[in-house]
Each structure stands twice: as C-alpha cells, then as structure tokens.
Amino acid sequence: MKSFIKYLYSKCLQILLFPFCLFPIQKNRLAFTGLTGGKGYDYSCNPRYLSDYIREQEKDTFEIYWMVTDPKQYRDKEEKDLHFVKHFTLRSFYYLLTAKVIITNGSYAPWFPFRKKQYLINTWHGGGAYKKIENDKPDANWATRKRAEF
C-alpha cells in the first residue's frame, strides 16, 4: 500500500510539473546534477568533469546549469555559460525540463517527467557493473518496477 501511495504521489507531481513542458527545449542548454552520497546535490563527481570538459572544448557554445543544494557556495565559479541553481525549486525544474541534455550520476527522482526529446545521461557514481541498481535490487518496490516499465 505504501508503494502505491508513493506512485500516486509521483503522478500528482508529474501533473503539477506539466506546465513546464510547454516551454520549448533549448538545444544549447545542458543541465547537470551531481549526487554526493546523501549530502545533497553538488558540483562534483563525473558530471563535473564532463561539464568542465565541455566548457573547455566548446567555450560559449552551451548554457550549462547545475542543480545544487547550495548555489551560494559556487558564486565565484559562475560565468556567462555556467550557472548554479538551487535544486528542487521551480527555477531548477524549468531548466531541467528545457535542457536538451541532462547529465547526472545517480538515479534521478522517479517522478520527474523528463521529455521524450531530451537525453538523460547517467554516469552512475562509482560505477555500476558491481552494484545492484534500480530493478536489480531484490527489494525493488512496486513504484520502482512501475517506473522502469515506462
């Protein structure tokens, strides 16, 4: 029953976020999230190195938005093409739903309504070949399995 309630909750959140899908996807916009082992979202790990590499190779070609727990921490790093936004705010949802590519290193919120014309790249923090992830877990609940079917 608990997993069914989570599933209904996720569907309600998807409906609430739907208006953001009315905005066009920006081909030059990249959104990044870096999960840091229970400490929140940070400018770190594999997504950070991809972000830095893209900025180095394609200077001023892309708008790069990082969804982080504390954007004030990165004020000194912000530039014309690099921005930090507080994660799980309306502003972060806007950038996530209008980016052509989203790069993350962990399982993103299962209720998040990514769009069909977006690319979601997951670098799987710490590798994945030796870890149980998502549906591979023996205790994967109903909501997790239902999301994987999508």
Describe each region flagged by the PLM.
Residues 30-150:
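Active-site and donor-binding regions of nucleotide-sugar-utilizing enzymes
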Residues 1-38:
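Membrane-proximal basic amphipathic "stem/tether" segments
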